[in-house]
Amino acid sequence: MSKNLLIELGLEELPAYVVTPSEKQLGERLATFLTENRLSFEDIQTFSTPRRLAVRVSGLAAQQTDLTEDFKGPAKKIALDADGNFSKAAQGFVRGKGLTTDAIEFREVKGEEYVYVTKHEAGKPAKEVLLGVTEVLSAMTFPVSMHWANNSFEYIRPVHTLTVLLDDEALDLDFLDIHSGRVSRGHRFLGKETTITSADSYEDDLRSQFVIADAKERQEMIVEQIKTLEVEQGVQVDIDEDLLNEVLNLVEFPTAFMGSFEAKYLDVPEEVLVTSMKNHQRYFVVRDQEGRLMPNFVSVRNGNDQAIENVIKGNEKVLVARLEDGEFFWREDQKLQIADLVAKLTNVTFHEKIGSLAEHMDRTRVIAASLAKEANLSAEEEAAVDRAAQIYKFDLLTGMVGEFDELQGIMGEKYALLSGEDAAVATAIREHYLPDAAGGALPETKVGAVLALADKLDTLLSFFSVGLIPSGSNDPYALRRATQGIVRILDHFGWRIPMDKLVDSLYDLSFDSLTYTNKADVMNFIRARVDKMMGKAAPKDIREAILASSTFVVPEMLAVAEALVKASHTENYKPAVESLSRAFNLAEKADASVHVDPSLFENEQENTLFAAIQGLTLAGSAAQQLEQVFVLSPVINDFFDNTMVMAEDQALKNNRLAILSDLVSKAKTIAAFNQLNTK
């Protein structure tokens, strides 16, 4: 008869960002433990609050399944001595399995007999197996851990309670310095210690003590309460998903409420107000039906609605202090001069091994000028890029960004406009940070995109030049994100700038502040980011073929990846790739100094293939270029069927290899076709 298992770990307050991943990890680790220990189950449900992680297993088998295993031993000729008795080898084998020689039988395998024994192991009761679940808790990993009291061990937070119930029976376990029981803790202020009656009563037992153990239920409660406030107040609330996920892991019993602040603060830029509310106070932003910001906010209390008026006043008071800061900085920053702030950047360190922020900007300005020409920007756009590159970090020294660093670039744009800078310059100051996250928004203007590229390129080259290169998952300076941004921007704007030539040109630049080094590492790093971009849809062989091509133009490479993936599902893909691969492999034997001499042609097939190669222009989209190469497959095959490429006559051989080399030279601008898998 199956049973239900409950495990709850009661902890000191967990960081909100740790709660959900830890809940998931606990469920996955327990499922693995049960499977490995041959305890079948029907379902696993996980729970979490800021002060507990829990899991309930439904339909858990009462005991392990029996285990029957066959073990192969030595050959019969080794297992028996001259008198037909079991040798020491046979005796040692069965002894190692916990059996006797009575269990031996001989089975024929590929014409020879071997010793076999079958071991039967009866399943243990679930209760006995579950004594090992503390291994699951010990194996949990966290981004941060701590010691407490005089204990030698460490964990995410101090452990206060451990509840392990099999139906209504409490199992006797020890974890760290805690002995298991059936006592759990209710809400820190509204509840008290409570007894968990059984695995099935878990949620109800905690609910009576003002704890909603199911995170999904808490989330639904928060959303429903906010929706009710929207209807009652005739407003719209920005239910930001990330904020919602954070808030639900800050409360055990949620109660949403609406507060307000003076309308005068609406004169401060919206981004400042939103940052103050959302990022610093964990409040939801309120708007009117037209989407305009209102002097209100929605927060979620960890508790019921008792004395909610006092809670609202307290939250309003805390927010007003933030808004006062924002209003003050907004007013005072406008008294500053951009030129003065830029001059002070010489005293701001970009990185101690690299130099000042001003030096970083100087290098970025040079790179941006080069990129502007490569991207065919207009003279007006080039001028905007140059001006933006001279000042684009000035807002880092404003009071507002010093207090709210999330607003860097955003405030730079606003202050630049107030100072009379051109709109394109101001926008570029904001956009140079983009994308600021994986999959984040990209610059919308060419000026902003060029500045973003230049800033990211100097950042990448500078850190690599001083040996600060990401390794494994360690990337403290977000260089992977910066490089991914470079790739995405180039693709988004369709700028066909050869990446290898661009990097070569950057390494030819001379700066007093820094000398770029480690070029090979930089190129490999960029290739890895392009590979990651292609990896979303393209299999490994296609990615490798494109990365081995003779061109490194990001938009073209990504387009070829898409075209090859589509082509790989067509019937002519395999024969075309195979004929091209044969040409690629033979062309590796060609003498680069030899050029095709048509006077040495001995058959029509040589002439036909050479003419086809001469006429191969590779124009149009990636798919069209691919088709232009693929249609040569019959011509290539006809050439191979009628021509001995590796002829004994050295001149003929070199000439025929030169034909193939010409073909490969053009085809390789698309991909190294011999890297593709047709099996």
From Swiss-Prot:
Cellular compartments annotated: Cytoplasm
Cellular component GO terms held in the UniProt record: cytosol
Protein name: Glycine--tRNA ligase beta subunit
The organism of origin for this protein: Streptococcus pyogenes serotype M5 (strain Manfredo)
GO molecular function: ATP binding; glycine-tRNA ligase activity
InterPro entries: Gly-tRNA-synth_bsu, Gly-tRNA-synth_heterodimer
Assembly and interaction partners: Tetramer of two alpha and two beta subunits.
Keywords, ordered alphabetically: Aminoacyl-tRNA synthetase, ATP-binding, Cytoplasm, Ligase, Nucleotide-binding, Protein biosynthesis
Family: Belongs to the class-II aminoacyl-tRNA synthetase family.
Pfam family, one: tRNA_synt_2f
Catalytic reaction(s) noted: tRNA(Gly) + glycine + ATP = glycyl-tRNA(Gly) + AMP + diphosphate
EC number: 6.1.1.14
Any one GO BP annotation for this protein: glycyl-tRNA aminoacylation
HAMAP family reported in the protein's UniProt record: Gly_tRNA_synth_beta
Major place of residence: cytoplasm
